[in-house]
Amino acid sequence: MGTISKTDLKQQIKDGIIVSCQALPGEPLYREEGGIMPLLVKAAQEAGAVGIRANSVRDIKEIKEVTTLPIIGIIKRDYPPQEPFITATMREVDELAALDIEVIALDCTKRERYDGLDIVDFIKQIKEKYPEQLFMADISTFEEGLTAYEAGIDFIGTTLSGYTSYSRQEEGPDIELVDRLCRAGIDVIAEGKIHYPDQVKIIHDLGVAGIVVGGAITRPKEIAERFISALHK
């Protein structure tokens, strides 16, 4: 498990960008044999990224070979019919904890979980099992963020705003949610639908602990689609 202190990590990631480097099966940059994500990480590091968010044991192992930047790790694994799929059970937490990464991120929404646990009970379990590990809650509403933070989660990520049926549906980042969480004294890592540099500046000035940008940097198909669609508006 990661051994960095929360204070030290906050110092490392403040005033910078954490770049999410992920590709899922069916996406252009996904290869069964791997090897692509470390290249994206190298590019992000050369650009000045202060951290990396990555998915899967394989990708994280490969990424750790090319960078010493702090890593926020997740495992995306479906558990139908339940909706949560980002580090959704103790199985994924165990797999990530074995990788010695700085932060483990997990779904902390109020949606029904595959393991049947209340999210507060699950947080209690992972904190007891891995007391030195830093955790990030991926949430979609203020109430979810507050619940996770009060339960002991270190960082609250706005990752899932717009991706749950009951959260705010917007084209861009949920800046209002970020602002409200920051005003509540919560350590926020803003993430989700951050497409443009000017949005990053606005979010930074709200007082966040960190900012994650993914698709706008590391998903070339998504980037190309944004340019192409602009021609037809």
Swiss-Prot record:
One GO process term, biological-process aspect: N-acetylmannosamine catabolic process
EC number(s) per entry: 5.1.3.9
Record keywords: Carbohydrate metabolism, Isomerase
GO terms, molecular function: N-acylglucosamine-6-phosphate 2-epimerase activity
Pfam families (alphabetical): NanE
Disulfide links within the chain: none
Protein name (Swiss-Prot/TrEMBL): Putative N-acetylmannosamine-6-phosphate 2-epimerase
